[in-house]
Amino acid sequence: MKFIKIALTSLVIMTGVSLSAQKKIEKFEKLEIEMFPKAKEGYKQVYIQLPIAKNENDLKVEYFVGADRMVDCNQQSIMGSIKKKDVEGWGYSYFDVDSKGESMTTLMGCPDQKKTKKFVTLQPEITRYNSRLPLVFYIPKDLEVRYRILKPESDLKKATHK
């Protein structure tokens, strides 16, 4: 009898875990990127699939294209540009990154010359949040895309005047 109780309890727990895992999977729209062009030579296609969220109009996505580099105390960034392009006939957009991965840096003196690993990026950009379509990027093979979700802090506040 004790064995049956343990077996039933285990079954209920496993079913609950399975259902919660399914719910997590169902929070994403079906990924469809076949209509996007193939990456050109020396580039790769990467994408961000955003989960379904409440009030998506309130959210933004800030994305960073860059690479881990060993840097000193100077401010560094990667030279290049990000152009938003459209998939012909579909009305979908993607981001094409044009960069050779070269860095520009300030020229401050760094007395200890201690280098640390840091994610060095092109100028970050912000786009609207849309869980129905992936954010597709074409980037040089030696770069990567990282992102964060920007959420409103609170209700709107009024500006003051003199």
Question: What is each PLM-predicted segment?
Answer:
Residues K23-K83:
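N-terminal, charge-rich interaction modules
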Residues R128-K162:
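C-terminal partner/receptor-binding element of secreted or periplasmic proteins
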Residues M1-K23:
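Bacterial Sec-dependent N-terminal signal peptides
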Residues E56-Q123, T127:
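Mature extracytoplasmic domains of secretory-pathway proteins
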Residues Y43, W90-Y92, R132:
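Extracytoplasmic
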